Amino acid sequence: EKTILTPSEKFELIEYIIRQHQLKNIVSYLCELAGVSRSGYYAWLKAASIRQQKDLDDEVDFELILSIFKQKKEKVGALPIKMILENDYYVVMNHKKIRRLMRKYGLIAKVRNANPYKKMSKATQEHKTCPNILKREFNQEEPGKVLLTDITYLYYANGQKAYLSCVKDGSTNEILAHYLSTSLKMNIVYKTLKRLKEAMQNQFHPEAILHSDQGFHYTHPLFQKRVKKLKITQSMSRKGNCWDNAPMESFFGHFKDEVDYKECNSFIELKQMVDSYIEEYNNHRYQWGLKKMTPVQYRGHLLAA
């Protein structure tokens, strides 16, 4: 299946290659290879801070929208939210902006549609939770069978916020895929899933389970559709129970304790720090629970057994 990248995704890939391999002198070549203009790449690079600020502003407004959405049990659309904002919070926000943010972050109201012919399509659009199939049986001694995922926030550069999405192998502790973003829109989990697919070379364990919390990313119908397409079974923690995904929480805890990410002055610097830590963690972090091996070594050990 051929993957078509948008110009923005191509620019992001070029920037990643240049940063990862320190190849500053081949911008023109990479742009030509990707079929994009050199001037377009530099314009995209220059606008990065503007995009980050716009995403941060969106997130502030979205958190307010989300609080109302949850308060009303996910049964309100853009117009009711606009009226609640004005009357209860004294905040004036255009209904088109509210609708845009709801669409951007995947909020879909559970409201009854007057048209009976749309009932079936509506049902497919509602967020759905999944049972806790895993039941804390994280280590099943089979690489790729238990896949744990979650998102955490990272504050850097005087209060700017980024979000780190990861997938961890429950048997080997290896971080199989990760994606860092300045926004919480659905793209963060789509990108993570795509990187997981690439890391696994699209060859998943026949009984693979993807375990997460009940966050709106993981209950979103489009995300669930993508997981199902990979023939992976979804499992979710019980509401408000962080112990149901303890190994993933543990990794984030170690990262925050060991990395001076708050000292980063830019998103690019933070991204480099995250990439470097995960590379070191997977390949050079010896763990007592893995028979004193690294996650990558332990994966090889289990596969050879």
Name each region found by the language model:
Residues 221, 228-232, 256-305:
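C-terminal domain-tail junction helix/linker
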Residues 90, 138-140, 214, 241-243, ...:
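Conserved, non-catalytic sequence blocks in retroelement Pol enzymes and Pol-derived host proteins
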Residues 111-115, 209-214, 228-246, 263-265:
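RNase H-like polynucleotidyl transferase catalytic core
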Residues 30-31, 41, 65, 81, ...:
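Mobile genetic element proteins and their domesticated derivatives, centered on retroelements
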Residues 160, 179-203:
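Active-site beta-loop-alpha junctions of metal-dependent nucleic acid enzymes
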Residues 136-176, 182-184:
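An active-site-proximal beta-strand-loop segment
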Residues 1-34:
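Helical coiled-coil/dimerization "stalks"
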Residues 3-8, 31, 40-142, 296-302:
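Basic, flexible linker segments flanking DNA-binding modules
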